[in-house]
């Protein structure tokens, strides 16, 4: 389990990191990807991506916590996909264990299509282990992304598991289950939980 924080200022970053670190956690994920208007409207989550100076200020305290591994989840930007390109140089200077980049803007939320061209621009410049996020719903989707971006460290499945709960099992076993197999596995799982 890796806790996630959603800070809006350096002080809030410290407060949240102290609280989570005080519970013994040594890995913390920083959320700059939440697209929901009530969060983004407060310049948090993906809403902060419009403000590079705020991003720099919020992430600066990473250096104060050498005992904690920080990772970052983010989107291409809030309004347009070029916003992440303004941040990549800053992010490359920070001590991050990984970055998970959702290939949509915050304004898109989960609508429209991921922008793979914009993702590629970030992918080519990012010096941290990078993970792809966005519309991974099948084994074929995973293969296509890993083929196009061979230096990725992996993909985040996220919501894809809601529509295809066996997706991780399919990926691990490198096989796509037939509908009958899906039903059989689901029934077996249901009996285990009963």
Cite the ranges covered by each PLM segment.
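Glycine-rich beta-to-alpha transition loops that act as phosphate-gripper elements at the mouths
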Residues: 74-78, 131-140, 159-161
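Catalytic cores of alpha/beta
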Residues: 13-19, 82-87, 136-153
């Amino acid at each position: 389990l890796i806790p996630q924080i959603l800070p809006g200022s350096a002080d809030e970053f410290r407060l949240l990191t102290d609280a989570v670190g005080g519970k013994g956690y040594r890995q913390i994920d920083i959320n700059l990807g939440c697209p929901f208007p009530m969060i983004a409207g407060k310049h948090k989550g993906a809403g902060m991506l419009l403000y590079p100076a705020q991003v720099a200020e919020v992430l600066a305290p990473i250096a104060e916590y050498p005992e904690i591994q920080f990772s970052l989840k983010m989107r291409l930007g809030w309004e347009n996909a070029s916003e992440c390109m303004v941040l990549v140089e800053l992010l490359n200077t920070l001590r991050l264990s990984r970055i998970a980049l959702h290939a949509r803007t915050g304004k898109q939320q989960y609508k429209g299509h991921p922008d793979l061209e914009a993702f590629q621009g970030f992918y080519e410049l990012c010096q941290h282990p990078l993970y792809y996020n966005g519309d991974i719903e099948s084994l074929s989707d995973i293969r296509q992304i890993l083929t196009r971006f061979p230096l990725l460290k992996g993909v985040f499945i996220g919501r894809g598991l809601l529509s295809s709960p066996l997706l991780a099992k399919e990926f691990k076993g490198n096989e796509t289950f037939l509908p009958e197999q899906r039903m059989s596995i689901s029934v077996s799982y249901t009996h285990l939980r009963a």
